[in-house]
Regions:
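Flexible hinge/capping segments at coil-to-helix
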Residues: 34-37, 43, 140-157
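Short loop->beta-strand "edge-of-pocket" segments that line small-molecule binding or catalytic clefts
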Residues: 51-54, 150-165
Length: 286
């Protein structure tokens, strides 16, 4: 090969080499494979909201305000206890006549409705520690001559169906006595007393005193009788719900210990209770 040919060969080779180098430099790098997605932790389950059945026609324990909200002594006490126990609750207006069926069927987790702790009820449901002391009381018109429970034997007596007032009057007059007039609520029975449809009403002292004080035009008076045994209210739960029962008892004990219970009691009844409602239930109000 002549020197000229050699020089051309080298130039051509150099150009080819440079082209190959540029092509190699211009090649894009392949993208690295994307990392496998990391499984996210499951979202925490929402906190359970316990359904509380209450017959909101029993002031001052439970009633509805002008906004339709359920308010009252029971509501404040159990709301405060639930907060202490770290549980969420929701009150649902539930007619008294079906309230325990709703509990038994699981439609309600608890019943808070001035429910008296009785041996009969304890056979089918569990109760929290008592939170209110009650007793039956007679309401009559101011001019009535009734001075004791036995005076009602020949009179027309109004009661709320299925309450301990109903039980007491049934024992005195006989369960099927036509002189016993049964109503869906105690306020309805008291309205009937005001209009003259019945001669007396027997019901829990708290609701009777509240109604009489707020209806001065009815010209009522109240009559106490030692024959009426003390009663206590408790929170009713489905039989065997021991975990919820323990939490509620914990909450009730806490609000009694820190003074919250006394504050609520004074709000509704004008003064703190004479004694705490923490003794065992002694008898078979609402």
């Amino acid at each position: 090969m002549s020197p000229l040919s050699t020089r051309r060969f080298l130039q051509t080779a150099a150009l080819l080499g440079a082209g190959l180098l540029l092509a190699a430099c211009g090649k894009k790098e392949e993208a690295a494979p994307a990392p496998a997605p990391v499984a996210s932790a499951p979202a925490p389950a929402p906190a359970k909201v316990y359904a509380v059945g209450t017959d909101a026609a029993y002031a001052p324990f439970e009633s509805q305000n002008e906004k339709g909200e359920i308010v009252g002594f029971d509501v404040d006490v159990v709301t405060a206890a639930a907060k202490k126990a770290g549980i969420e609750i929701k009150f649902i207006n539930t007619p008294w006549e079906g309230i325990f069926n709703a509990l038994g069927q699981g439609d309600r987790d608890m019943v808070v409705s001035a429910v008296t702790i009785t041996e009969e009820r304890k056979a089918t449901m569990d109760f929290s520690a008592p939170y209110f002391d009650a007793q039956q009381l007679i309401a009559v018109k101011e001019n009535s001559k009734v001075s004791k429970f036995a005076d009602l034997k020949k009179l027309k007596v109004g009661v709320q169906t299925g309450t301990t007032g109903d039980e007491a009057v049934s024992k005195l007059l006989g369960k099927t006595n036509p002189n016993i007039k049964r109503f869906e609520s105690t306020p309805l029975a008291l309205k009937e007393l005001e209009s003259g449809g019945v001669d007396a009403v027997v019901a829990d002292n708290g609701v009777v005193i509240h109604y009489v004080a707020n209806n001065p035009g009815g010209k009522f008076k109240t009559v106490a009788d030692k024959e009426f045994v003390p009663e206590q209210y408790g929170i009713a739960l489905k039989k065997g719900n021991t975990e919820l029962l323990a939490k509620l008892n914990e909450g009730l004990a806490a609000i009694k210990a820190d003074g919250t219970y006394d504050q609520i009691y004074t709000k509704y009844f004008g003064a703190p209770p004479a004694k705490a409602a923490d003794a065992p239930a002694s008898a078979a109000s609402k």
